[in-house]
């Protein structure tokens, strides 16, 4: 790895340690991830290699670029494009984010997601810390450490995905079969956070997270969400909250509230897709050419 001069540790992601490094061949900064072994004698899991290979094919302006992969001393190194900050850092230093800037950020997130979902890849860990911003201000989806292919329709997945505050209700209720709708819910939570400058559902544990959601959006019933009572962690004793009008939660552009309503639909199959969300009137200023 003499090609890459490590400069500083940036943190630890899903995969392992992340460092800022200088690429001495291409003369640019990169983000270098060193993959953790599950056990010392395991080597690198075949599934990780296979899924990372898929990410090498994910070339899109709003998906972080994976430049290369190296194997050295039984460790796997991923070489990503370097981004200056993440959305969490951006929000932390911004007192108020104008609606036009929010529109641009969410639009780019959805463009990246639509591309991933088209290629049948779920991100499964959408949160501000995993949404990167490069020096040009372009939004990049990052950290695909929990990403999975959905090409096998009846495949069952773990429900232990997505950081708690951004976790979709179907995941919290124990669903093991799910699709891109989980990423849409997470994006809606980020969208709302950009508007209110505060996390929407700050649960301390899974049940508290459910209650935080239900107390704002209402406790789902079979009439609202067909099949909800059959999910593993659903309880008939859940408190019965009524849904609040989203206008009382978000004091912003009417079209933004309407889009949030469609992104926060409980029934996963009815939740708006990333591709359809991009066509929503909220994004008209970005979709319509200037006259």
From Swiss-Prot:
The keyword tRNA-binding does not apply. Belongs to the protein kinase superfamily. CMGC Ser/Thr protein kinase family. CDC2/CDKX subfamily. Forms a stable but non-covalent complex with a regulatory subunit and with a cyclin. This is Cyclin-dependent kinase 2. PANTHER family: CELL DIVISION PROTEIN KINASE (PTHR24056), CYCLIN-DEPENDENT KINASE 2 (PTHR24056:SF254). Its EC number is 2.7.11.22. CDD domains: STKc_CDK_like (cd07829). InterPro entries: CDK (IPR050108), Kinase-like_dom_sf (IPR011009), Prot_kinase_dom (IPR000719), Protein_kinase_ATP_BS (IPR017441), Ser/Thr_kinase_AS (IPR008271). Residues 4-283 form the Protein kinase domain. Keywords: ATP-binding, Cell cycle, Cell division, Kinase, Mitosis, Nucleotide-binding, Phosphoprotein, Serine/threonine-protein kinase, Transferase. It holds the Pfam family Pkinase. Phosphorylation at Thr-14 or Tyr-15 inactivates the enzyme, while phosphorylation at Thr-158 activates it. It comes from Entamoeba histolytica (strain ATCC 30459 / HM-1:IMSS / ABRM). One of its GO terms (cellular component) is cytoplasm. The modification Phosphothreonine is found at residues 14, 158. The active site is at 125 (proton acceptor). One of its GO terms (molecular function) is cyclin-dependent protein serine/threonine kinase activity. ATP binds at residues 10-18, 33.
């Amino acid at each position: 790895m003499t090609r890459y001069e490590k400069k500083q540790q940036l943190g630890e992601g899903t995969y392992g340690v992340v460092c800022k490094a200088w690429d001495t061949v291409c003369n640019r900064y990169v983000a270098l991830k060193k993959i953790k072994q599950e056990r010392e004698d395991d080597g690198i899991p075949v599934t990780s290699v296979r899924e990372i290979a898929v990410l090498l094919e994910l070339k899109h302006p709003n998906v972080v670029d994976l430049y290369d992969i190296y194997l050295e001393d039984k460790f796997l190194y991923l070489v990503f494009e370097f981004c200056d900050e993440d959305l969490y850092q951006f929000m932390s230093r911004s007192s108020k984010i104008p609606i036009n800037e929010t529109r641009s950020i969410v639009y780019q997130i959805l463009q990246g997601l639509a591309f991933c979902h088209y290629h049948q890849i779920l991100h499964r860990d959408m949160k501000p810390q995993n949404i990167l911003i490069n020096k040009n201000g372009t939004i990049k989806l990052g950290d695909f450490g929990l990403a999975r292919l959905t090409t096998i329709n009846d495949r069952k997945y773990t429900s232990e995905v997505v950081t708690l505050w951004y976790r979709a209700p179907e995941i919290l209720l124990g669903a093991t079969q799910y699709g891109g709708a989980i990423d849409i819910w997470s994006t809606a939570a980020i969208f709302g956070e950009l508007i209110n400058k505060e996390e929407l559902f700050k649960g301390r544990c899974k049940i508290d997270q459910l209650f935080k959601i239900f107390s704002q959006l209402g406790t789902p019933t079979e009439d609202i969400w067909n099949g909800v009572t059959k999910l593993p962690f659903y309880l008939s004793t859940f408190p019965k909250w009524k849904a609040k009008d989203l206008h009382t939660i978000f004091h912003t552009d009417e079209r933004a509230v309407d889009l949030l309503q469609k992104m926060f639909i409980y029934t996963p199959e009815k939740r708006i897709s990333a591709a359809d969300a991009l066509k929503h009137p909220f994004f008209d200023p970005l979709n319509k050419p200037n006259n």
